[in-house]
């Protein structure tokens, strides 16, 4: 069966998350319904990341197996037409034919996320579902300094959800940077894989550093405590964006991760 890689953009606001669930509309479910409407095929689409309810994506990647071959751009356009007709807040940015060995989840080398904080006194209107509003001033340089305590290979028990199903809490965090442009503070994180709620837990803890409530040493101590109670608040989902997934460029699609 021909396999296709899909690059997907979505507004996570109306969805219970990426993963198909019984308690509401999901991004995966909407995509599978679009495929069913287009081809009559019942498929199971696999995504590179299972974003939570309210989390957005500008570069989620998924793969799907279809019964016949498609010209990729025609598949993209046809799926987008079905998604638009259904009123879905989802767009297929690109479709690409890939070998059977390609797996959107397990072939991934690195995932990139962005967390957006709007730090200003006035409540958000245009950005209401696009960022975390923090009314108090935040010191982004203090946040960045604290973030560097988390970069590297660590046991991130402190920063994962109690409901996380990953076998191991150990991950290698390649990047955690904080920058500012006017009222907007951006936290950018990169790793091969993340634990459930890990980035939102980072964001909540770094907010406390920006408020002067935690020092970089406090953040390091929280990490080393391996205790969920040492974590700051879990930041709300609307500030989180799944930006991009990196894959091998040499065509070697062997599984790089089983997390």
Curated annotation (Swiss-Prot):
EC main group: isomerase
EC number, UniProt record: 5.4.99.12
UniProt GO molecular function: RNA binding; tRNA pseudouridine(38-40) synthase activity
Catalytic reactions of this protein: uridine(38/39/40) in tRNA = pseudouridine(38/39/40) in tRNA
Family membership noted in the UniProt record: Belongs to the tRNA pseudouridine synthase TruA family.
Purpose: Formation of pseudouridine at positions 38, 39 and 40 in the anticodon stem and loop of transfer RNAs.
Name this polypeptide is given: tRNA pseudouridine synthase A
Taxonomic lineage: Bacteria, Pseudomonadati, Pseudomonadota, Alphaproteobacteria, Hyphomicrobiales
């Amino acid at each position: 069966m021909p396999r296709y890689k899909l690059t997907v953009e979505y507004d996570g606001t109306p969805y219970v998350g990426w993963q198909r669930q019984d308690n509401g509309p999901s991004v995966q479910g909407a995509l599978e319904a679009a495929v069913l409407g287009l081809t009559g095929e019942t498929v199971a689409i696999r995504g590179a990341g299972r974003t939570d309810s309210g989390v957005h994506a500008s570069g989620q990647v998924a793969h799907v197996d279809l019964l016949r071959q498609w010209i990729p751009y025609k598949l993209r356009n046809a799926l987008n037409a079905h998604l638009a007709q259904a009123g879905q807040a989802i767009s297929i940015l690109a479709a690409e034919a890939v070998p059977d060995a390609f797996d959107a989840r397990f072939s991934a080398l690195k995932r990139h996320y962005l967390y957006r904080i709007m730090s200003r006194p006035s409540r958000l209107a245009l950005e209401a579902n696009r960022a975390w509003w923090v009314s108090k001033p935040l010191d982004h340089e203090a946040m960045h300094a604290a973030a560097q305590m988390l970069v590297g290979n660590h046991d991130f028990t402190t920063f994962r959800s109690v409901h996380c199903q990953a076998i191991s809490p150990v991950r290698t965090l390649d990047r955690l940077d904080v920058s500012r442009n006017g009222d907007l503070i951006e936290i950018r994180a990169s790793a091969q894989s993340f634990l459930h709620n890990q980035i939102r837990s980072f964001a909540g803890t770094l907010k406390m550093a920006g408020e002067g409530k935690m020092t970089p040493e406090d953040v390091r101590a929280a990490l080393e405590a391996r205790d969920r109670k040492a974590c700051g608040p879990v930041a709300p989902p609307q500030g989180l964006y799944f930006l991009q997934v990196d894959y091998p460029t040499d065509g070697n699609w062997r599984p790089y991760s089983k997390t």
